[in-house]
C-alpha cells in the first residue's frame, strides 16, 4: 500500500468498498446511476452540473423543520427525532426559530384564534418554505370538523405541500411524508419558489 507496488507504480491504493456477499462485487456496482456517475468522474476527473441542480440537491439534504404542534399529533412528531426513527439521517433537523426553518409541520387541531398566529409564523420563514399538514385535524378539521371554533384544514390559512393522513399518523407516516417532500423538491426545485 502506497505509491509503489511490487511490479507497477500506483498513484493511490485501489478502493476496496463494501462487498456484496452474494455477488462478490462492490455494493452499488450494478446501479446504472452509480455507473454513469463513476464513468463521468473517471473520464473527466470532475462532474459537471448546473448551479440550480446543485442547490436543489443540497436543499433536499439539509431541510430544517419547525414544529407547530397543536394537539396529540405533536407526540408522534417528537418520535421522529428519537433514535428509533432518527430523522436526521434523512437530512432533516429541528429548529426552534421560524427564521431558520425551511419546513413547518402543522400537527393538530387549528382553531380560529390560532390561525393568525400560524400565518404570522409562516410569513417569518425564509423562501423557499414548505408546509407539511400532519393528521386529520390539520388536514380537514378531523374529529372537530363541525365545531364553530375549528379551521377545517390548515390549507385555508397557509399553502400546504404534503398531507400526512391519520389520527394520529404514525412516525413512519410522517417520515414518509418528509421523503415525499424531498422528492417533490428534487422534481420541482428551483432557486426561487
Curated annotation (Swiss-Prot):
**What does it catalyze?**
a quinone + NADH + 5 H(+)(in) = a quinol + NAD(+) + 4 H(+)(out)
* GO biological process: one example: electron transport coupled proton transport
Task: Report the main location listed first in the record.
Answer: membrane
Q: Which cofactor does it need?
A: [4Fe-4S] cluster
Q: Which residues form a coiled coil?
A: none
Q: Does the keyword Transferase apply?
A: no
Q: Does the record's keyword annotation contain Iron-sulfur? A: yes
Entry-linked InterPro entries: NADH_UbQ_OxRdtase-like_20kDa (IPR006137), NADH_UQ_OxRdtase_20Kd_su (IPR006138)
Keywords, A to Z, come to: 4Fe-4S, Cell inner membrane, Cell membrane, Iron, Iron-sulfur, Membrane, Metal-binding, NAD, Quinone, Translocase, Transport, Ubiquinone
What's its EC?
Answer: 7.1.1.-
Pfam families the UniProt entry points to: Oxidored_q6
Binding residues for [4Fe-4S] cluster: 72-73, 137, 167
Q: Can you list the GO cellular component terms from the UniProt entry?
A: plasma membrane; respiratory chain complex I
Q: Which PROSITE patterns match?
A: COMPLEX1_20K
Q: How does it sit in the membrane?
A: Peripheral membrane protein
Q: Which GO terms describe its molecular function?
A: 4 iron, 4 sulfur cluster binding; iron ion binding; NADH dehydrogenase (ubiquinone) activity; NADH:ubiquinone reductase (non-electrogenic) activity; quinone binding
The listed locations are: Cell inner membrane
Q: What class of enzyme is it?
A: translocase
The cross-references to HAMAP family, in alphabetical order and at most eight, read: NDH1_NuoB
Q: How does it assemble?
A: NDH-1 is composed of 14 different subunits. Subunits NuoB, C, D, E, F, and G constitute the peripheral sector of the complex.
Q: What does this protein do?
A: NDH-1 shuttles electrons from NADH, via FMN and iron-sulfur (Fe-S) centers, to quinones in the respiratory chain. Couples the redox reaction to proton translocation (for every two electrons transferred, four hydrogen ions are translocated across the cytoplasmic membrane), and thus conserves the redox energy in a proton gradient.
Family statement: Belongs to the complex I 20 kDa subunit family.
The protein's name is: NADH-quinone oxidoreductase subunit B
This chain's source organism reads Brucella abortus (strain 2308)
Amino acid at each position: 500500500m502506497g505509491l509503489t507496488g511490487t511490479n507497477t507504480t500506483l498513484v493511490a491504493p485501489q478502493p476496496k468498498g463494501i462487498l456484496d456477499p452474494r455477488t462478490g462485487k462492490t455494493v452499488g456496482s450494478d446501479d446504472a446511476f452509480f455507473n454513469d456517475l463513476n464513468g463521468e468522474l473517471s473520464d473527466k476527473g470532475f462532474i459537471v452540473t448546473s448551479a440550480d441542480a446543485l442547490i436543489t440537491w443540497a436543499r433536499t439534504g439539509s431541510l430544517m423543520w419547525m414544529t407547530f404542534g397543536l394537539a396529540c399529533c405533536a407526540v408522534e412528531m417528537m418520535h421522529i427525532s428519537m433514535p428509533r426513527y432518527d430523522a436526521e439521517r434523512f437530512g432533516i433537523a429541528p429548529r426552534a426559530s421560524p427564521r431558520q426553518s425551511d419546513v413547518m409541520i402543522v400537527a393538530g387541531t387549528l382553531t380560529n384564534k390560532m390561525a393568525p398566529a400560524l400565518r404570522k409564523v409562516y410569513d417569518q420563514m425564509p423562501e423557499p418554505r414548505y408546509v407539511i399538514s400532519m393528521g386529520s385535524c390539520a388536514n380537514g378539521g378531523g374529529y372537530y370538523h363541525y365545531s364553530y371554533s375549528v379551521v377545517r384544514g390548515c390549507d385555508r390559512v397557509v399553502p400546504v405541500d404534503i398531507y400526512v393522513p391519520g389520527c394520529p399518523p404514525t412516525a413512519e407516516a410522517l417520515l414518509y411524508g418528509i421523503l415525499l417532500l424531498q422528492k417533490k423538491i428534487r422534481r420541482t426545485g428551483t432557486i426561487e419558489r
